[in-house]
Amino acid sequence: MAPSGLKEVVGEKILNGVIRSVKKDGEWKVLIMDHPSMRILSSCCKMSDILAEGITIVEDINKRREPIPSLEAIYLLSPTEKSVQALIADFRGTPTFTYKAAHIFFTDTCPEPLFTELSRSRLAKVVKTLKEIHLAFLPYEAQVFSLDAPHSTYNLYCPFRVGERARQIEALAQQIATLCATLQEYPAIRYRKGPEVTAQLANAVLAKLNAFKADNPSLGEGPEKTRSQLLIVDRGADPVSPLLHELTFQAMAYDLLNIEQDTYRYETTGLSEAREKAVLLDEDDDLWVELRHMHIADVSKKVTELLKTFCESKRLTTDKANIKDLSHILKKMPQYQKELNKYSTHLHLADDCMKHFKGSVEKLCGVEQDLAMGSDTEGEKIKDAMKLIVPVLLDAAVPAYDKIRVLLLYILLRNGVSEENLAKLIQHANVQAHSSLIRNLEQLGGTVTNPGGPGTSSRLERRERLEPTYQLSRWTPVIKDVMEDAVEDRLDRKLWPFVSDPAPTSSSQAAVSARFGHWHKNKAGVEMRAGPRLIIYVMGGVAMSEMRAAYEVTRATDGKWEVLIGSSHILTPTRFLDDLKTLDQKLEDIALP
């Protein structure tokens, strides 16, 4: 079976390209990693998968470890000064080294000075393998990637970091190129015209990809691959999406609940005394995958239906499938504890979201949607937006960040307000402590103060959508329009120029694809997708509604296209505002993530 998504592609690359490539029957090895490589591995492989491949122990290179001189070690490391020094130190020992021999795999290109240092050390005598596997990104979901570089927004957009910008662009470009190479893609590269940084990053990615292509001329070959594209877009193209209260399950939960490192914590009651449970929300949970993009209004209904079907399939009758009922079902069917716990978790999560929604969020959603759309539920243009926002700004019960979200949406709708008006709005809302955060939207290309009254907006033109929506979920992320135009080959070439000429599309492709279908095998024997991919990189963080759009557009093409989206990091609205807050600060004044 072909890998179904990014996590599987990366997992296969680590298992085949690293661990199995040095595996010998009946021989155990130690796996040593640093923090970045551990994050990559844990995002796509289970510990049991690793141990099943003849690995006896997995260790952190930066922690004190017991020497095991009888075993060989596999090192999977990022090529940094700290990790290379720790690696050299493992083979400095007398009378014995920490391990018998070293198989070294760097996640990316090792800088020349570090390489020289390695070759001059005692380690050089016992190195059996030394490879660069070019895997400098995290597969966050099947169609979502992260470069795990949340600080890059600050480096790219803060005026005090202009000197860092070129270096940051080079680093991001290298990471994006490793993503394309891992997927066997050599896409045509396009960028949103306007901001300098999008063109700079697009050109830098092309240079890095050309270097990969020189090493591996077959990169990007195969039926239909010539249609693959990489789009570089900046957060300023759509500052609205990360500000809205989204009502689809994943985005809503991450916005309203305290979910850290994808872990949802909640109190369980019923079976005995209350206790805290921690549940990882990831793609190993098929129920989460089924529910995460659903509107909250449909989630509880769906879980209840699925639970009922499950109980009926096990010949158990239930009256009301609610949480209290679940503990009663569990007593009757203890053997299905794992499955029932899953239903219980998602009922809890949905319930938790609804409690917050009914509390204060519901009244904000209508205002936010009207401001984002510029029209009300009837499609009538908003004539007096000030009337909409004043009750929210004056309401002491609304938290500061929620007021700021509404304020920024108002400013974006008006395409800037006068200095005097801005001061009044900030005072009404009582968010004086955050006035620089609001002004920092300008660093992303938004207009905050506009002395001559409302100016002309540089927003991208929107598609008209006629499909029915929930009244509080009328907004569609701009990026979804862009994805649809790209896969239909309707993206405006003036607004989205190519940095390299697109490959000519010829009728011969159809014949080839009929021969190969959408999959072909690469050298390692792993099936790779042969249909075209649209890869989108958003500078400044990607919102969860935009992640959802990638799946929706893929589905709408019946799998002819696969849309991937990613960024330096994943945004929640709070995270987006926290990022904005730093954009006028000096490095020594902030704690970067």
From Swiss-Prot:
Highest rank taxon of the organism: Eukaryota
This protein's record includes keyword Protein transport: yes
GO terms (BP aspect): intracellular protein transport; neutrophil degranulation; presynaptic dense core vesicle exocytosis; vesicle docking involved in exocytosis
Record's keyword terms, sorted: Protein transport, Transport
InterPro entries xrefs: Sec-1-like_dom1 (IPR043154), Sec-1-like_dom3a (IPR043127), Sec1-like (IPR001619), Sec1-like_dom2 (IPR027482), Sec1-like_sf (IPR036045)
Transmembrane segments: none
GO CC field: azurophil granule; cytosol; plasma membrane; presynapse; secretory granule; specific granule; tertiary granule
GO molecular function: syntaxin-1 binding; syntaxin-3 binding
SUPFAM superfamilies: Sec1/munc18-like (SM) proteins (SSF56815)
Annotated function: Involved in the protein trafficking from the Golgi apparatus to the plasma membrane.
Protein family (similarity comment): Belongs to the STXBP/unc-18/SEC1 family.
Complexes and interactors: Binds syntaxins 1A, 2, 3 but not 4.
PANTHER family in the record: VESICLE PROTEIN SORTING-ASSOCIATED
Name by which UniProt lists this protein: Syntaxin-binding protein 2
Lineage: Eukaryota, Metazoa, Chordata, Craniata, Vertebrata
